[in-house]
UniProtKB/Swiss-Prot annotation:
Keyword terms: Ribonucleoprotein, Ribosomal protein
Compositional bias (Acidic residues): 138-149
Protein name: Large ribosomal subunit protein bL17
Species of origin: Bifidobacterium longum (strain DJO10A)
Cross-referenced NCBIfam families: L17
InterPro entries per UniProt: Ribosomal_bL17 (IPR000456), Ribosomal_bL17_CS (IPR047859), Ribosomal_bL17_sf (IPR036373)
Chain residue ranges for the region called Disordered: 137-183
Any single biological process term in GO: translation
Amino acid sequence: MPTPKKGPRLASSPAHERLMLANMATSLFQNGRITTTLPKAKRLRPLAERLITFAKRGDLHSRRRVMRVIRNKSVVHILFTQIAEQMEQREGGYTRIVKIAPRVGDAAPAAVIELVTEPVAKKAVVKEAEAAAKVAEEEAPAVEAEATEAAEAVEAVEAPVEETAAAEAEAPAEEAADAEKAE
């Protein structure tokens, strides 16, 4: 567990605070998200992230270290099998704290702490895609210029063929007209 902050504790004694954080961590892993006060959520986050890191290791020693905090074996099993697999690609930042409206009874600042289950957006892949898009944009004008040149060349080749075909069609007509005049 991280070094406690100086000043008043969340509960009346250090033992009570440890038990309260362990119970909140158990509830977080069972339900995926819990609603609590903001100071409790901020104190729970480092503990929960450390337990998830142990679960990702997956060895016996890590399981025993988690069992020191979370006494419920079924929750430990869920943590090591399901949650650790979900967080396999993530290198930290397993939890998210979202502030919500103050609590109705005493106006205490409330928050929701939840496990982050969205897949990790790979930055390297995004950078490679952006680089490929830039290269494609640079090559696109060159390809378009080549395509227009090729189209113009095809039109130039087709135009003389059409002109010669038209000239040949006119030539017999002219010869026929000359022959009629001669007769």
